[in-house]
Amino acid sequence: MAKVESQAGELQEKLIAVNRVSKTVKGGRIMSFTALTVVGDGNGRVGYGYGKAREVPAAIQKAMEQAKRNLNKVELNNGTLHHPVRGVHSGSTVFMKPASQGTGIIAGGAMRAVLEVAGIHNVLAKTYGSTNPINVVRATVDALVQGQSPAQIAAKRGLRVEEILG
């Protein structure tokens, strides 16, 4: 599952998966490791990283550095989403919709780790298709970035926020 570490920079780091991979060469197999991590500030910023190295700690370090470089802003509404969102990457499709206070994170595996570090506390989520952690994480971040606040939608349409909210 996911391991959690806190850092002085107030970023939450989670390790989602470590895999052993091999490259076959004339002399045999060369083993290396890959690591998938997510990083977030718990307040609407989230990023993911994928690192590969000959040793596990080096792969994790590379993944963490990449995740910190690739932070995305997510629009939150009191610990949940503003509206339902859908994200797709490769064979994975994720669907998330806002939930009322006290619901918690109803999501599994890699998606749960992304939502926790992003600062989302109440959400209903489902993964369709492939549950490969890399594709699920990328689809989840894609969906979260698509989310827009009522103020952003109003500005895009040239209306007032009250008109958008009905």
Swiss-Prot record:
Q: Which UniProt keywords apply?
A: Ribonucleoprotein, Ribosomal protein, RNA-binding, rRNA-binding
Q: In UniProt terms, what function does this protein have?
A: With S4 and S12 plays an important role in translational accuracy.
Q: Which gene encodes it?
A: rpsE
Similarity remark = Belongs to the universal ribosomal protein uS5 family.
Q: Show the GO cellular component annotation of the record.
A: small ribosomal subunit
Domain-level remarks: The N-terminal domain interacts with the head of the 30S subunit; the C-terminal domain interacts with the body and contacts protein S4. The interaction surface between S4 and S5 is involved in control of translational fidelity.
Self-association and partners: Part of the 30S ribosomal subunit. Contacts proteins S4 and S8.
- Top-rank lineage group of the source organism: Bacteria
List the InterPro entries: Ribosomal_Su5_D2-typ_SF, Ribosomal_uS5, Ribosomal_uS5_bac-type, Ribosomal_uS5_C, Ribosomal_uS5_N, Ribosomal_uS5_N_CS, Ribsml_uS5_D2-typ_fold_subgr
Listed name of the protein: Small ribosomal subunit protein uS5
Domain named S5 DRBM is located at 11-74
Q: Tell me the disulfide pairings in this chain.
A: none
**Example GO biological process:** translation
Keyword Ribosomal protein carried by entry: yes
Q: Name one GO molecular function term.
A: rRNA binding
